[in-house]
Amino acid sequence: MYKRQELTREQAIQQILDELSPNDIVVSTTGMASREVFEYRAQNNQGHQRDFLTVGGMGHASQIALGIALQKADRQVWCLDGDGAALMHLGNIAINGSLQPKNLKHIILNNGAHDSVGGQPTIGFQVDFLKIAQASGYQHTSQAKTTQEIKNKLAKIRELSGLSLLEIRIKKGARENLGRPTLTPVQNKERFMKFLSP
């Protein structure tokens, strides 16, 4: 039996975004996570140019983030992944480890469920993402379960040079009134590309 998680994904994402710098790059996984990123930016008048929302691309966020990290080595790249998405393309962790981008910060929001497509259970709480990452060559791995732990871990990760993974244990579910992005994927891409330009 697994201990019930108290932190929501939305609380975790808000805490993450609060800790990032204006020049940091964010790639978020498909579904609820990207919707929560978009809504939080809108509510705080932060704009959406810093975030690439991986709409309909389950499992691909970390490889998109990897490509950006390799090309933008002078900037921090944060990948907001899900346990279901990470498990779907588990080889991505090995690829990240083999290429060793020092500026890639891989965050897995683990609620043990495919939350965006019906809430079916995953094996996210049975798999040890930290050990998989370590065996694949990630230099720094850690886990958080509270907003304070997220704050502390992110502060440490930011100062570390090297490929990092932070697993955040969360409960499944989302607000019933959670909105959807009001930008099209093409508009998101164009604003994001402009943000990446020198």
Give the label of every model feature segment.
Residues 29-39:
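N-terminal glycine-rich anion-binding loops that anchor highly charged ligand groups
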Residues 1-5:
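Conserved small/polar residues in nucleotide/adenosyl-binding loops
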